[in-house]
């Protein structure tokens, strides 16, 4: 698994698109209009607390860059079949399960590197400009509890769902899912936003960081009066936040397991 992880990491980190896609996304977002990415460096506009600034930054960058993250990973698993190297890999000592785990962790980590660079870069710049060095500790905590579970969830489905459909179709559907299930508010239409299976990290933000938006008026977790799927929106508590993280990881493991079984079944038929 380690050898596969290293190989996949090196292959993915060298792809220009892994760096260009998040860079262009951030540049375009900043140029479109005012946002926290710009306000962080304006003493009159930036949030008064380092915690609010860093968690708000995590929310914006996660919401923006996770779409590209999933799309960039969509062809990593099916590529072996397309290039007809799967039979060669099957002849190596590494088991298919270990190779899948190595590909998942290696390619996923490499694709997440630019996201981490962007996030910690902005957090460091904020800490320097504001003098609030506690922002770096908040950034580490937010990355581990908000970013990582969501990215692991997205990576698992981005690798395995293209086994069932063409990668371009998955990218289109995934972009639609991400906007519907994470950005659309529950009072507009039925959505998974604000539920315990919300990969944007609503429950960790609300329960672990007491985050309700920069102005304190947003609700990222918990029941919404009149909204559908409120049975998936218990009141946000630290216990429920950790349960939400665990559910995302369990779903990621389930997706990988299903992908592994599908590939084994395909090998058996062939």
Please provide the spans of the model-predicted regions:
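Transmembrane alpha-helical segments in integral membrane proteins
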Residues: 67-81, 154-168, 240-266
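Short helix-to-coil transition segments within interhelical loops
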Residues: 88-97
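Aromatic- and glycine-rich beta-strand/loop motifs that create alpha-glucan
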Residues: 1-25, 266-269
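Secretory targeting signals
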Residues: 27-75, 101-169
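Hydrophobic core positions of alpha-helical segments in small-molecule transporters
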Residues: 21-23, 101-102, 173
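Transmembrane alpha-helical core residues of multi-pass small-molecule transporters
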Residues: 24-28, 106, 176-181
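Terminal transmembrane helical anchor/hairpin motif
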Residues: 38-44, 48, 172-270
